[in-house]
UniProtKB/Swiss-Prot annotation:
This is Protein CASP. The chain crosses the membrane at residues 602-622. InterPro entries: CASP_C (IPR012955). Belongs to the CASP family. It comes from Schizosaccharomyces pombe (strain 972 / ATCC 24843) (Fission yeast). Residues 39-60 are annotated as: Disordered. Residues 623-633 are lumenal. Keywords: Coiled coil, Golgi apparatus, Membrane, Transmembrane, Transmembrane helix, Transport. Residues 111-339, 369-433 form a coiled coil. The lineage of its organism: Eukaryota, Fungi, Dikarya, Ascomycota, Taphrinomycotina. May be involved in intra-Golgi transport. It comes from the Eukaryota. The gene is coy1. One of its GO terms (biological process) is intra-Golgi vesicle-mediated transport.
């Protein structure tokens, strides 16, 4: 196909090269000028001929014989000019035909040119996209290489940190064991001394108790020895004070033992934490506070977005429920209107309808006929119907616009949810980096001047890659504060966007409610207008105009709607005129066309029936052809 198209293009180009198109245009211009001149001369000649023929007809027969030759010459010259015009036109036509008659149609060539231009544009766009993709691929490859290098360095630093941590843990274990053994020895010596003192004090207490008993016995026997008793009582008081002092010393020793035990426990559990410096503790506290702030902000953003989504969903559900309820009410009212019928009321309304009359707007038109009033009423109803149709169209357009706005707002909400998820992922990555920083601070404290710590490599990168030096503690704090500021700005932006979205959704919901109420009013007015139009048409056909006026027409119209009764009457009259077969068909059609589901099922049944008939006819035709084939042979 490509070879054939190239051959056609070559033929077209060669034929249009050999066609002398510019020369043909020039010749055509010259021929057009000559034709215009000939047309002018021919018009002048015709005018002369017409004038002379009129004069010739007016002259008598004797003069006509003398002027006949002049007229014949004029006619001959006119015929010669016409022949010249025809010959010149034929010559120009044949020249154009000879040059362009065999030339093929240039339309495919133009299409090919347009397609070529389109393909060239597409190729240029694809080239640009290719260059952009190549640039992005190169950037991604560079990033992957950098990530691989960083991972390798991280693995190296992890291995070094683990080895140094193991060494330091072994050293601290040995030191703790030594200190613990020394303290145990001290505690044992102290316990032995305390036990000996306690034994001495208990023995003294027993001796004092025995001496006090003896003293009591002697006091009961010898009342005269008062001075000795006083001396002994003083001694007893001194011994008791010594006992109190000994008890206090015992309590103090027990408290010191408990404190020493707690210190040993703290030394066992916190031997590895003694090496942490105050700066590292400050950094740990800063990272903990930063993580807590970020987590609280994230939770607040999540709760706000969740509440907003819940409000949106609730509003949408309420609107859907209201629409469903309105549809149900409408269907119920339609069913009731179709089913409701009462013979007595219809009979009474028929008797009144024969004499009913539309009340005029002015009191001066009381003597006018009913037909003129009906015509006026018809004009008013037609104008109202046109206005209501225009308002209905405007309301439907507004509803479509509001639905589009609601869908656009839902899309915005989904986009914000995706952005929040990305933020959560970024915060999780920040938490992971903080944990890595906390676990590797021991290595950073004793690192050499020529090596990077793991935290500095994570926060700032490799100096060979980014042409920078080892980051200090201030750089870590600055990066953390920058991350917090960025996240706060994003949070404020999302809150503002959420507030605007909530306001827009509430405004859209209010507009939708107003439009739905207006639509319901328009539908009601449309039904009333339709009933009035039907009643007017029937009244003009079946009732002759009369001058009788009924005074109770206005009161009756206020109490009873004659249009609904007329519609029922008309339906019953048409149904009574039907035959049995027509009634069956009418009932079937009414059941089939009652709802969308029945209509769809009936339509599908018709399609399947037609397809079945087509298949049967095709099979019969094929069978007939196969039956007639041996007869032909």
């Amino acid at each position: 196909m490509a070879v054939a198209s190239e051959a056609l293009l070559q033929k077209l180009t060669e034929s249009w090269k050999n066609s002398r198109f510019e020369e043909l245009q020039r010749e055509a211009d010259e021929a057009a000028a000559e034709i215009e001149k000939m047309q002018k001369t021919s018009l002048d000649e015709r005018k002369e001929l017409s004038s002379k023929t009129k004069e010739f007809r007016k002259q008598p027969d004797e003069v006509k014989l003398g002027e006949m030759k002049g007229l014949l010459k004029l006619y001959q010259s006119g015929i010669d000019s016409l022949t010249k015009r025809a010959k010149s036109a034929e010559a120009t036509f044949f020249r154009v035909y000879e040059t362009l008659g065999e030339v093929p149609d240039p339309y495919p060539l133009l299409i090919e040119a347009a397609n070529n231009l389109k393909t060239q544009k597409q190729i240029e766009d694809l080239k640009k996209e290719k260059e952009e993709m190549e640039g992005s691929l190169q950037g991604k490859e560079k990033l992957e290489r950098e990530v691989e290098n960083l991972r390798k360095e991280l693995d190296k630093y992890k291995d070094l940190v683990e080895t140094e941590a193991e060494k330091r843990a072994a050293i601290t274990k040995e030191e703790c064991e030594k200190s613990w053994l020394e303290q145990q020895k001290l505690y044992k010596d102290m316990e032995q001394e305390n036990a000996s003192t306690i034994q001495k004090l208990t023995s003294k207490i027993r001796e004092l108790q025995a001496s006090q008993l003896d003293h009591d016995l002697q006091a009961s026997q010898n009342e005269s020895a008062g001075l000795d008793v006083n001396a002994k009582s003083a001694e007893v008081n001194a011994i008791l004070s010594e006992l109190d002092d000994a008890n206090k010393i015992i309590v103090e020793l027990q408290a010191e033992i408990a404190v020493l035990k707690q210190n040993t426990k703290e030394q066992k559990s916190g031997s590895s934490q003694d090496d942490l410096s105050n700066q590292q503790k400050q950094q740990l506290d800063f990272m903990d506070s930063l993580n807590k702030k970020l987590s609280t902000e994230l939770e607040s953003i999540k709760e706000a977005s969740r509440k907003e989504m819940e409000t949106h969903c609730a509003t949408i559900q309420t609107l859907e429920n209201e629409v469903k309820e309105a549809r149900k009410v409408k269907e119920e009212s339609l069913t009731l209107a179709n089913k409701f019928s009462d013979y007595d009321e219809i009979k009474r309304e028929l008797s009144v309808l024969k004499q009913i009359e539309f009340s005029g707007e002015h009191a001066t038109h009381e003597n006018t006929s009913l037909e003129s009033q009906l015509l006026k009423r018809e004009k008013q109803l037609s104008e109202e119907l046109a206005k209501l149709r225009s308002t209905n169209a405007q309301l439907t357009d507004r509803i479509t616009q509001e639905s589009k706005k609601a869908s656009f707002l839902e899309q915005k909400a989904s986009e914000q949810e995706e952005v929040i998820r990305k933020l959560e992922k970024d915060l999780a990555d920040v938490d992971v980096e903080g944990s890595v920083y906390l676990s590797n601070t021991t290595y950073r404290r004793e690192g050499t001047s020529g090596q990077l710590s793991p935290t500095s490599s994570i926060m700032g990168g490799n100096p060979s890659l980014f042409n920078g030096s080892v980051l200090s503690r201030n750089s870590v704090n600055e990066t953390g504060s920058a991350i917090v500021d960025v996240i706060k700005q994003q949070r404020d932006r999302f809150r503002r966007a959420n507030v605007t979205l909530v306001n827009q959704v509430s405004a859209a919901n209010d507009k939708i409610a107003l439009l739905e109420s207006k639509l319901e009013e328009v539908e009601k007015s449309n039904t009333l207008l339709y009933e009035q139009m039907r009643f007017r048409d029937h009244y003009q056909k079946h009732v002759e105009p009369s001058s009788s006026h009924l005074q109770t027409a206005a009161a009756y119209e206020n109490s009873i709607s004659p249009f609904a009764s007329f519609r029922k009457k008309e339906a019953e009259r048409a149904y009574s005129r039907m035959g049995s077969f027509e009634r069956i068909v009418y009932a079937l059609l009414r059941t089939l066309l009652f709802s969308r589901a029945t209509r769809g099922l009936f339509f599908m049944y018709l399609i399947l029936l037609h397809l079945f008939i087509m298949i049967v006819l095709l099979k019969l035709g094929i069978a007939g052809n196969t039956a007639y084939t041996p007869m032909n042979y």
